[in-house]
């Protein structure tokens, strides 16, 4: 992955749709809240999609804490920066021209998984395979149909991912997210308008999924592993 290099990319020269959205102050602000090593310029999206295609994102940010994520989103909203939120890049198609504005990826550090009885809560960046493995180790089953999907929890909620006759909505209890005012909200699965590869989040692309809780059942986890 590329790092910020002023010799290769002049901070004040990034242009979006003929306008200078970015200047040194804005980029320094993003680096200040997300961490300098977590802010990359002209980052090829092919490095972050399972299809391995896609041109550069003007600015690519990977917050590694929830606090850093909130501060990054706040900076983008306050400065009216074009914003795209992505997860693990599974089934994400990006054109050769890339993505204008700021791309925030949730997969780097936002991947905690907690098991409490038959409930499993996973951060948006956690991989479905890791959630299924954690559940199986706790003797829980129910994630098997979607465990092989190479995507994140956030992406699975966003599009109601499914495979082998099962879908995310089959096990989902609730989703915690930030709306476009950065208000922390929790919605039960029944209020997420989840259908075939769709959910309420597709209608609200500025909402940022933080975590999801699934309800599983006791079983022979060893058979899943």
Please report, for each region that a protein language model flagged, where it lies by residue.
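An amphipathic, basic-hydrophobic helix/alpha-beta surface used to engage anionic
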Residues: 151
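Phosphate/pyrophosphate- and phosphate-bearing ligand-binding catalytic cores of soluble enzymes
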Residues: 2, 6, 40-41, 47-50, ...
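N-terminal glycine-rich flavin-associated loop
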Residues: 45-83, 95-140, 167-186
């Amino acid at each position: 992955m590329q790092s910020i290099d002023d010799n290769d990319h002049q901070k004040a020269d990034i242009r979006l749709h003929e306008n200078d959205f970015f200047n040194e102050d804005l980029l320094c602000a993003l680096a200040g809240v997300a961490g300098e090593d977590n802010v990359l310029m002209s980052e090829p999206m092919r490095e972050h999609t399972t299809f391995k295609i896609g041109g550069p994102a003007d600015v690519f940010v990977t917050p590694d804490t929830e606090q850093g994520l909130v501060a990054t989103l706040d900076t983008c909203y306050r400065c009216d920066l074009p914003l795209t939120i992505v997860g693990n890049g599974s089934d994400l198609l990006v054109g050769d021209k890339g993505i204008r504005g700021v791309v925030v990826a949730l997969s780097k550090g936002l991947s905690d998984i907690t098991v409490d009885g038959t409930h499993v809560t996973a951060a948006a960046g956690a991989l479905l395979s890791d959630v299924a493995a954690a559940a199986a180790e706790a003797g829980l089953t129910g994630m098997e149909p979607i465990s092989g999907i190479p995507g994140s929890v956030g992406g699975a909620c966003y599009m109601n991912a499914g495979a082998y006759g099962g879908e995310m909505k089959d096990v989902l209890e609730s989703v915690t997210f930030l709306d476009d005012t950065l208000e922390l909200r929790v919605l039960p699965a029944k209020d997420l308008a989840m259908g075939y590869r769709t959910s309420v989040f597709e209608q609200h692309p500025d909402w940022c999924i933080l975590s999801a809780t699934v309800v599983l059942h006791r079983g022979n986890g060893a058979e899943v592993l």
